[in-house]
């Protein structure tokens, strides 16, 4: 184990939609890496129970995607509440990173943070206010070095743990291909 204020917390959420005022979190996962993007530990992967009334708010894309991945079935079977998911995740993170030190890391992570702020403020408060958003680097690369993007592709399973692993791999790719580090 390597507890450090230099470790990075990666998080991904799957939600019933894109509006935190209307939709809910249905899955979350975390990974901790060191500052060199080496995976140190994978946190709990949690399907969060939501009532049918919340699942009914999903649009066609969410319903199709989350049903095909098996996530909807896992959410229906889950007994884990949002508060329990927070407690499990914080117990994991506290082993690896002090509170307030790691930026929140991921792809389009601002969207995840909006949901955390609304539905899981205790967990959101554990992160530093800064972001490491891989999608920002992707958008800059698309504009400044578009040929580089042809060298990397993602599967896009829309399962939280898989998405985090892909985000880390994507940042490792940009580190070598764009930043030449």
Curated annotation (Swiss-Prot):
Keywords: Cytoplasm, Exonuclease, Hydrolase, Nuclease
Gene Ontology CC terms: cytoplasm
Subcellular location per the Swiss-Prot or TrEMBL entry: Cytoplasm
Alphabetized Pfam families for the sequence: RNase_T
Single GO BP term: DNA metabolic process
Leading EC class: hydrolase
Gene3D superfamilies named among the record's database cross-references: Ribonuclease H-like superfamily/Ribonuclease H (3.30.420.10)
Active site per UniProt: 129
Origin: domain of life: Bacteria
InterPro entries in alphabetical order: Exonuclease_RNaseT/DNA_pol3, Oligoribonuclease, RNaseH-like_sf, RNaseH_sf
Record has Cytoplasm as a keyword: yes
An annotated Gene Ontology molecular function: 3'-5'-RNA exonuclease activity
Family indicated by similarity: Belongs to the oligoribonuclease family.
HAMAP family: Oligoribonuclease (MF_00045)
Chain's role: 3'-to-5' exoribonuclease specific for small oligoribonucleotides.
Protein name as catalogued: Oligoribonuclease
Taxonomic source organism: Vibrio cholerae serotype O1 (strain ATCC 39315 / El Tor Inaba N16961)
């Amino acid at each position: 184990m390597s507890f450090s204020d230099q470790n990075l917390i990666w998080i991904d959420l799957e939600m019933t939609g894109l509006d935190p005022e209307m939709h809910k979190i249905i899955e979350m996962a975390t990974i901790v890496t060191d500052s060199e993007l080496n995976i140190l530990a994978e946190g709990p992967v949690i399907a969060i129970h939501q009532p049918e009334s919340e699942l009914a708010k999903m649009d066609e894309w969410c319903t199709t995607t989350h049903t095909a991945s098996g996530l909807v079935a896992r959410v229906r079977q889950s007994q884990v509440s949002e508060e329990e998911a927070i407690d499990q995740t914080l117990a994991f993170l506290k082993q690896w990173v002090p509170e307030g030190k790691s930026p929140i890391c991921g792809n389009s992570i601002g969207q995840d943070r909006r949901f955390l702020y609304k539905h899981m403020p205790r967990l959101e408060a554990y992160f530093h206010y800064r972001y490491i958003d891989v999608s920002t680097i992707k958008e800059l690369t698309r504009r400044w070095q578009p040929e580089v993007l042809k060298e990397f592709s993602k599967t896009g399973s829309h399962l939280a743990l898989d998405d985090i692993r892909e985000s880390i791999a994507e940042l490792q790719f940009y580190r070598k291909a764009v930043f030449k580090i």
